[in-house]
Swiss-Prot record:
The lineage of its organism: Bacteria, Pseudomonadati, Pseudomonadota, Gammaproteobacteria, Pasteurellales. Belongs to the UPF0231 family. It comes from Actinobacillus pleuropneumoniae serotype 5b (strain L20). This is UPF0231 protein APL_0968. It comes from the Bacteria. Pfam families: UPF0231. InterPro entries: UPF0231.
Length: 125
């Protein structure tokens, strides 16, 4: 997972590689408004590790995105992705674009992403 952080007058902004765009959307939407939530997320990451090889999962439901953690994988998904969508209304040759709505990565990659965000935020905020 590749990512980049920048700083603007609005604070820290995350950008992620194409297959992981939803992680940037989640961080920019859910975490920048409530950075203390990272404490709870890191605690759940540790619970996932401690539970391994047994199954453990946790969900953080946000206003626009929800975060799903388990021992192996992290998924972030836009809450509106489950809204009913009539694909028959799409013109021929077009597809529904959802790359910014759902993404997956490993638990360790996700933890590294959050730690890099914290470090950048402390350095440039």
């Amino acid at each position: 997972m590749e990512y980049q952080f920048t700083h603007s007058i609005h604070g820290v902004v995350a950008k992620c590689s194409m297959d992981h765009e939803a992680f940037a959307g989640w961080l920019n939407t859910e975490i920048t408004e409530n950075p203390k939530e990272l404490i709870n997320i890191f605690a759940e990451i540790e619970k996932c590790r401690a539970a391994y090889p047994n199954h453990y999962e946790c969900v953080f439901e946000g206003k626009e995105y929800s975060l799903f953690l388990d021992c192996d994988e992290v998924m972030v998904k836009a809450n509106n992705l489950d809204d009913t969508f009539d694909e028959s209304q799409i013109e021929d040759g077009f597809q529904f674009y959802d790359q910014e709505s759902i993404a997956f990565c490993g638990l360790e990659d996700f933890e590294n992403f959050l730690k890099a965000y914290q470090k950048f935020s402390k350095t440039y905020h």
